[in-house]
Amino acid sequence: MKLKPIEVAEILQKEIANINCLSELEEVGQVITVGDGIAKIYGLANVKSGEVVEFKSGVKGLVLNLENDSVSAVIMGDDNQVQQGDNVKRIKEVLAVPVGKALLGRVVDVFGNPIDGKGDIASKEYRNIEVKAPGIIERASVSEPVQTGIKAIDSLIPIGRGQRELIIGDRQTGKTAIAVDTIINQKQAHLLTNEHDKIYCIYVAIGQKRSSVAQIVRKLEAAGAMGYTIVIAATASEAAALQFIAPYSACSMGEYFRDNGMHALIIYDDLSKHAVAYRQISLLLRRPPGREAYPGDIFFLHSRLLERAAKMSDAKGSGSLTALPIIETQAGDVSAYIPTNVISITDGQIFLESELFYKGIRPAVNVGISVSRVGSAAQIKAMKQVAGSVKLELAQFRELESFSQFESDLDPTTKAQIDHGKRLVEILKQAQYHPFPVEEQIVSIYVGTKKYLHDVPLQKVKEFEDKMLTEIRLNKNDILESIKNEKRITEETEQKLKTFLENFVKAFIKAS
């Protein structure tokens, strides 16, 4: 079959019309040197600090240093896949992570990719990991409580929604246990339909052992708390760059809840390892070291992260993001560089002491130097009614206790005060993974402060508390319900409680 010249011309015209002549302009550089997770790149003239670049192997890098003729990027992955001379492409993006309720119940890496083997995460929304913290006008004052379920904290060092409360102490003093207990304690609110009472939890493990993270996930699953929790893991075996990014990724996931009128709690476990990872990156980038070899912007590293926790104003949806950063001290030294930095950024600290822990006082909270700068604004009225004097009574007890070591003869008043203090300490003790509902905490503290334990032997105080709470749950549940619903102890409720306790104390002493 012969084609006429005019037909050939028509076919050629059609084909030419279908050709896509749009060419994409890519800015490409070249790796000059690579090592220790840092790549020095030549040729990316327009790249910005904090931008993501892509290496030939597909591994991504984060640009942190801009120099006269080159840029330095931290490699977010295996640096063995990046070779000298490799091309590096600018993708004109900053780091973003998936956010939303689809992540609840999952264990993810710093990029939001699932690492729990439960399939893909269907999240449609992405957020940048570095965003500006809410301004002054957008915020509201902290006025609603985050119930941790821990008597010593909810009564003496209350945490409010939108607060930043530091948990600080030596290793193995129960810092993570407090955080996990707080997550488990939110379960009751999630069984109800009222969205306002629900607090979604985010736990970010920075530089932890993989076995420790797995243990925490198993504990949360066993307690039925994983359904409202996201776990982000940047373990010790991962690159320092990933450990550095982890809290910012987690914070963006938490901000989704805050900005949509919901409430979230984020736990950074721990920021000491985060600071060490950033120090490693900074020294490899040849930034000048300062105190304890940390770079000069280490304060800004944590302040820009923790300032993102806030209680939003009504105009912004009244959501909140509460932060519980954890710091590990060396031999109880709270005056070291990172601890003092984070103490000055946060709205209070819960200080855990090894000495108390070894004495069997658990949670090992040192009430003397622990403080909540939000104070009783974050407590319900019923808790204020019973816990107002506890801190003072414990402080007086500590003073008298140290004084009594040198004095053999004590007058009856001092002896009674010491006995009362010992019983207060005993009633504030609590088993791990055993958070109490706030109404039961109030009854326990009421028993301690109103001196119902005077005739109960010290070693039987815990037994007394357990039996008393069991009895009140079974036969006097109306007292607990009244405290829970009214959020205060009415005269009628107090009268019922007094009658119940007087009868119960008599029966308990008689039985023992």
From Swiss-Prot:
The record lists the catalysed reaction(s) as: ATP + H2O + 4 H(+)(in) = ADP + phosphate + 5 H(+)(out)
| Catalytic activity, EC | 7.1.2.2
- Residues that coordinate or bind ATP: G169, D170, R171, Q172, T173, G174, K175, T176
Which GO terms label this protein's molecular function in UniProt?
Answer: ADP binding; ATP binding; proton-transporting ATP synthase activity, rotational mechanism
Keyword Cell inner membrane in the entry? The reply is yes
Indicate where this protein is primarily found. membrane
Concerning SUPFAM superfamilies, the annotation shows: C-terminal domain of alpha and beta subunits of F1 ATP synthase (SSF47917), N-terminal domain of alpha and beta subunits of F1 ATP synthase (SSF50615), P-loop containing nucleoside triphosphate hydrolases (SSF52540)
Ligase listed as a keyword: no
Residues with site note (Required for activity): S370
Listed under GO cellular component are:
plasma membrane; proton-transporting ATP synthase complex
Localization per record: Cell inner membrane
| InterPro entries the record matches | ATP_synth_asu-like_sf, ATP_synth_asu_C, ATP_synth_asu_C_sf, ATP_synth_F1_a_nt-bd_dom, ATP_synth_F1_asu, ATPase_a/bsu_AS, ATPase_F1/V1/A1_a/bsu_N, ATPase_F1/V1/A1_a/bsu_N_sf
Q: How does it assemble?
A: F-type ATPases have 2 components, CF(1) - the catalytic core - and CF(0) - the membrane proton channel. CF(1) has five subunits: alpha(3), beta(3), gamma(1), delta(1), epsilon(1). CF(0) has three main subunits: a(1), b(2) and c(9-12). The alpha and beta chains form an alternating ring which encloses part of the gamma chain. CF(1) is attached to CF(0) by a central stalk formed by the gamma and epsilon chains, while a peripheral stalk is formed by the delta and b chains.
Please describe what this protein does.
Produces ATP from ADP in the presence of a proton gradient across the membrane. The alpha chain is a regulatory subunit.
State the name under which the record lists this protein.
Answer: ATP synthase subunit alpha
Q: Per the UniProt entry, what species is this protein from, by scientific name?
A: Rickettsia canadensis (strain McKiel)
